Amino acid sequence: EWEEVSASAGDDLSGWTVDKESGFLRHEQGFVLEIEVVMHSDFDRMLFEKGASDRHIELLGYSSSDWKGSDLDTYAAKGVNFVVPSRREGHRELERPVEEASLLKYSDIKGVLHNHTTYSDGLNSVEEMALYAMEIGMEYLGICDHSKTAGYARGLQVERVLQQFEEIDTLNQQLWPFKIFKGIESDILGNGDLDYEPEILGRFDMVVASIHSNLNMTQDKAMDRLLRAIENPYTTILGHPTGRLLLMREGYPIDHHKVIDACAANGVALELNAHPYRLDIDWRYVDYAMEKGVMVSVNPDAHEKRGYLDMHFGVLSGQKGGLQTSQTLNALNLVEFEAYLAKRKK
């Protein structure tokens, strides 16, 4: 069987080594894949069993003898609503079912928010970022370079903010009906303040508020900073709420439910940072955000134009948590997003 798999794959297995005893494919860069060879008649059942977490199978009360020929019929026989494959994780999906049609898909994304340019630590100019956003079918772009406190990232002093505003105004005339929004990723300071004066913050179309400094803190300190930033009337989106970097850095401890409650109370959107090392907010809290009516923004935090494509990871992570199109900020079309921002300004 393994010889047949290897022969049919051909060059596609370049760099992979087959471990026949364990059934794993091991890549020279360290990736591991498990290959399960099954009879054609068992394929759908095995796909269901392998594609769901052990916890989901346990909560469903499922065993192989319960298989009814399809996943749809199997759920029906168990007397529960159908659960889409992306949500079979054993985390509230049986008690909080979501219709597949309402789940966010990548094709639902209309705009790309939270992006950096050569004004701070990005690799592409504002114009290059805009043109690529247009190329991949977006209706609008949010430029959110680093703010003045972020000296390590060439954060923007007020003079450079105003310079960028002028460039965006010119590009918006040239690229209409596509629109670039004037934003900033404003650092949340140690006391929870944002790092510009109110008269400057008020000139941005949108503000992503994020913590980048003094990450080694207690939950009480982290919550004080986050809640104060959420309550700031100029905050549009709370950026990467825990500051985690997967496989590299634990996030600072927070009470996710209190953060989401505060976002709901203050009309602040919650970022699902789509960078594969962040995926922050964690998908396990997305359903609570849906329950509380909080808008979630799937943001790439792009530092180059191709970083936009990280939104694919964000969409998949959001689906696991039941992220619905109707509560995804950047699934709004341009007119709807403009109205959303205008309402926030009142």
Place the predicted regions along the sequence by residue.
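Charged catalytic cores and adjacent phosphate/nucleic-acid-binding surfaces used
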Residues: 1-117, 123-143, 148-179, 190-346
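Short loop/edge segments at beta-strand edges and connector loops
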Residues: 182-184
